[in-house]
């Protein structure tokens, strides 16, 4: 006699539970304590969050937030972050880091954006920001008709959002077409001083502008306080701005003075507007639709050399090319790595760890760890090291700003048109700094 076998199908019910997003770390939690997102978990998170993101539409309508995040004001950005914090019960979000326009926020790129918030939290916010940008993609009109954007978005913020800065924080490995700029292309098309002037906001996000400059009791440094007015081709000479004083102890070494210079130069560029802005993207530098280049038709009058000629405070026992002054001259906002390197290279006291080799614009990092430490101090990033610094240098390869010298360790060369920008030949700088040709 055979035993009866129960072949009835069974239904297994899996209980689902809401993800506890309060597990997100606080800002003071070490990164090592936070598990990294894997590609598969990121994909699952992306799919799970898309439906929830749709709830932001009602919030946009209620608060009058534009659909295009590149048109957001600082208030809109704050409202968006606050909505996300409440919607997902996010923890550890520092709202001060998001004090910027939507255009500046979108221009950061993923790598820099993720530095604004703890792990997981930054991924959620970035995912939503990307979706919002893709939902509001609008084609440019090139037949003479004006685009549908409001006139107000042709300010410098609009320039930032659709300019070359939009690609600044994306390392070459993240491009979907990594070979869209070849070595031969770089050789045949060196970056011009005008293109160099257009590069902004790479490797860092804009700092919050201080209302009152820091007060210290030593070394005075001039700065320019720019009035909130439209810069036309006739009044773009930066020397027309009113002058003030900013005190800064050990101004080329202290973190506080670095931050104040960043904020002042950020104020300089963010309060400007370019009537002559090239509104239709140019693809001369990039053959990729997500990274259009937009350049102003006019650059500041004269060279940097002319700009600092009458400023005696910049000529005595200081770098020939202070990064803060160069950032102010170019209107680049926060100090950029290439500007910082030029400051160190034109400071005699730094020749023990970074110096010109004597061969044109070639330079060597004799102590790369010290260079990285100072860059981290300048940007208030104590975890900065040479590995991270070198990633920033590699980013410059495709931009034709800096190239690595083949066969030489820690040796690089500026390949952009520095002479037109600075007004100095490399030989002039070498003579001023008593540079002896490298024996290697």
Swiss-Prot record:
GO cellular component terms, semicolon-separated: cytoplasm; nucleus; transcription regulator complex
Segments for region (Helix H5): 426-432
Residues annotated with N6-acetyllysine modification: 8, 15, 305
Gene (UniProt): Ets1
Domain PNT per the UniProt entry, residue ranges: 51-136
Quaternary context: Binds DNA as a homodimer; homodimerization is required for transcription activation. Interacts with MAF and MAFB. Interacts with PAX5; the interaction alters DNA-binding properties. Interacts with DAXX. Interacts with UBE2I. Interacts with SP100; the interaction is direct and modulates ETS1 transcriptional activity.
Source organism: Mus musculus (Mouse)
Residues with Phosphoserine modification: 251, 254, 267, 270, 282, 285
Ranges of the DNA-binding region feature: 335-415
Post-translational modification: Phosphorylation at Ser-251, Ser-282 and Ser-285 by CaMK2/CaMKII in response to calcium signaling decreases affinity for DNA: an increasing number of phosphoserines causes DNA-binding to become progressively weaker.
InterPro entries: Ets1_N_flank, Ets_dom, ETS_fam, Pointed_dom, SAM/pointed_sf, SAM_PNT-ETS-1, Transform_prot_C-ets, WH-like_DNA-bd_sf
Pfam families, sorted: Ets, Ets1_N_flank, SAM_PNT
Name this polypeptide is given: Protein C-ets-1
Family statement drawn from the similarity comment of this UniProt entry: Belongs to the ETS family.
């Amino acid at each position: 006699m055979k035993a009866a076998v129960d072949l009835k199908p069974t239904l297994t019910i899996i209980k689902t539970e809401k993800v506890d997003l309060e597990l997100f770390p606080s800002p003071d939690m070490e990164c090592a304590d936070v598990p990294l997102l894997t590609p598969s978990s990121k994909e699952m998170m992306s799919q799970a969050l898309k439906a929830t993101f749709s709830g932001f539409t009602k919030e946009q309508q209620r608060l009058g937030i534009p659909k295009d995040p590149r048109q957001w004001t600082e208030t809109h950005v704050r409202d968006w972050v606050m909505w996300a914090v409440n919607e997902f019960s996010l923890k550890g979000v520092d709202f001060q880091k998001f004090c910027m326009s939507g255009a500046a926020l979108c221009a950061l790129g993923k790598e820099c954006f993720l530095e604004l918030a703890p792990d997981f939290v930054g991924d959620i916010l970035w995912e939503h920001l990307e979706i919002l940008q893709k939902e509001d993609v609008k084609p440019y009109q090139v037949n003479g008709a004006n685009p549908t954007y409001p006139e107000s978005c042709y300010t410098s913020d609009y320039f930032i959002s659709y300019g070359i800065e939009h690609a600044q924080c994306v390392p070459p490995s993240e491009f979907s077409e990594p070979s869209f700029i070849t070595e031969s292309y770089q050789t045949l098309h060196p970056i011009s001083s005008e293109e160099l002037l257009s590069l902004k906001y790479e490797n860092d996000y804009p700092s919050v502008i201080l209302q009152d400059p820091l007060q210290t009791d030593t070394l005075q440094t001039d700065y320019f306080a720019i009035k909130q007015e439209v810069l036309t081709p006739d009044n773009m000479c930066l020397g027309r701005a009113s002058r003030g004083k900013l005190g800064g102890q050990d101004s080329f070494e202290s973190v506080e003075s670095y931050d104040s210079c960043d904020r002042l130069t950020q104020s300089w560029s963010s309060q400007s507007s370019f009537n002559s802005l090239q509104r239709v993207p140019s693809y001369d530098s990039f053959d990729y639709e997500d990274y259009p280049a937009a350049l102003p038709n006019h650059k500041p009058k004269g060279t940097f050399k002319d700009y600092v000629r009458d400023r005696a405070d910049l000529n005595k026992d200081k770098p020939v090319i202070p990064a803060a002054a160069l950032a102010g001259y170019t209107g680049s906002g926060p100090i950029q790595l290439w500007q910082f390197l030029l400051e160190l290279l034109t400071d005699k006291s730094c020749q023990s760890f970074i110096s010109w080799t004597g061969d044109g614009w070639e330079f060597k990092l004799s102590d790369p760890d010290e260079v990285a430490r100072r860059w981290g101090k300048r940007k208030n990033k104590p975890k900065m090291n040479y590995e991270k610094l070198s990633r920033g240098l590699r980013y410059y390869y495709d931009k034709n700003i800096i190239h690595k010298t083949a066969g030489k360790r820690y040796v690089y060369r500026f390949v952009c048109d520095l002479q037109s920008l600075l007004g100095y030949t490399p030989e002039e700088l070498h003579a001023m700094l008593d540079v002896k040709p490298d024996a290697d």
